[in-house]
Amino acid sequence: MIHCYEDAIDNVVAHLKIEHDIDVVFEDEELGAYYHDAKIIGINTNETLQEQLYVLLHEAGHAILKIEHKKYLETCDETLQGKLSLLREEMEAWKEGKALADNMGIPINEGTWAVFCKQNLEDYIEWATS
């Protein structure tokens, strides 16, 4: 079992490179994002290590959805249907990220994870309902 955030981050980065040929970029101006065509995940180093890990797992979830499950490959438009599709993808990416952590033996504080997911999903919910 992995016990520190640096080790967990390093293991997820290695997993993404080995399994999916995805590079992870850590910069202070990066957005937490997965760039599918470029095969890059960006992580903002201004976040705490715990937040960086959680964002990395979430963005890995996007990669798993697109690469392994062949889901959400089309860009969503601004229609209600498109917004709901993006919201579904965001929720599924959090679930896939948690499953990846579990499979890799990365301990996740369930309460902190749930709050972090909720905070991040609220922006998408607000956008989708506007």
Language-model regions: role of each:
Residues M1, I67-K70, T129-S130:
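Short intrinsically disordered terminal tails
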Residues Q50-E51, G82:
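Alpha-helical hydrophobic/aromatic positions enriched in membrane-embedded helices and signal peptides
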